Amino acid sequence: MTYNFDEIIDRRHTNALNTDGFRGYIFHAGPEKVFPYKDEEFVRMWVADMEFGVAPEILDALRGRIDRRIFGYTGLYDDEYYNAFSKWCRDHYDWDFPREQLCVTPGIIPALYQLTETLCTKDEKVLVNTPAYGYFVHAAEYAGVGVLTSPLRKKADGTFEPDFEDFERKCADPACKLVFWCNPQNPTGRMWTEEELRKAAAIMEKYNLWVVSDEIHCDLIRCGRRHIPMAKVMTDYPKLITCMAPSKTFNLAGLAFSNIIIRDKTLRGRFRDRDKLFGMVNPMSLTAAKAAYERGGAWHEALKAYLDGNFAFVKEFFARELPEAVMYIPEATYLAWVDLGKCLPEDTDLPDFFANKAGVLLEGGNGLFVGNAAGYIRLNLAMPRSIIGTGLKRMAEAIRREQAK
């Protein structure tokens, strides 16, 4: 089957966060905030969901479930979903896990909040690498616990690596209880090597820390690469929790369905006991997730190839039009992490600048990515290439106008 990733789909007026909720999320404002551009004129390169239609194989499964006509209380009462997901894990990562370790939640973010509350007391802290996914810190703040940060080290080519000396110092803090490990890393797009994973694992095990490995981007990798779950490295470590989901890979975020794999039996029981949905799931979410893992393989491979082309397109654009910008093709994610430190004044509010001066919605800076992110923007490239081209052209023109002042 041929898949059309160049199709432009109108998402307005669907209550999509991407189109209808950006004021509150990016700018912490309501409808009173106005821009020189109409909402429909923005190029939206911000929140991490895709502008591509869902795989036809998944849509067919959803239509089939609709035809059953009843949408009563639903749970995972048979092994069909586990079998589909665990086979995907074996095929793609050469790894799987026992059925009893699988918990499902409406999302990884709710799981982060719940795990932090369950594992940490008020005098304890969580540790994150920076730049970081903001909800790692929000989960800690919600639970009333402290945050330790270990900045990733920037290399000469613009990519990042862990600073293991600093990471161990932070892990050794007596208050450190929990590490949020992002694998692949958001926003830098690093796929940690096996050596890096083993070094991090040895440190976390040495200090007997709980580890939440957020692996939601693990299937959004460059063609020819293979994800290494932290669980393949920490093979017997009982305090590891692995978080995966079909949502990012198959553009199903609104269906709110994620996999939380908890090894420790006691924690697993506490996690399930605190489940506000009592083990219930949305029947359409379950149908879509199962179909994704069973039938979505061909679409997934085509998606990766298209994303690789998008990254090459963006890399070439910056090299030609904005050579002072530092952009590398990441090993994973559909997110470009671009250093504009030499393009604009360091105190520039980048999301506000590009919204007002270019009509482009994006995220960036320390306010959204915790720290170690000044001068950086994160660009979502999971969209038709023609839209990316329009957005980049607007951004380059806005930067040139600003530089000419």
Language-model-derived ranges and their functions:
Residues 143, 206-207, 358, 402:
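Helix C-cap/helix->beta junction micro-motif
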Residues 98-99, 329-334, 374:
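Short Gly/Ser/Thr- and Asp/Glu-enriched loop/turn motifs at secondary-structure junctions
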Residues 2-5, 9-107, 114, 292-295, ...:
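N-terminal small-domain helix-loop-helix segment of the aminotransferase-like
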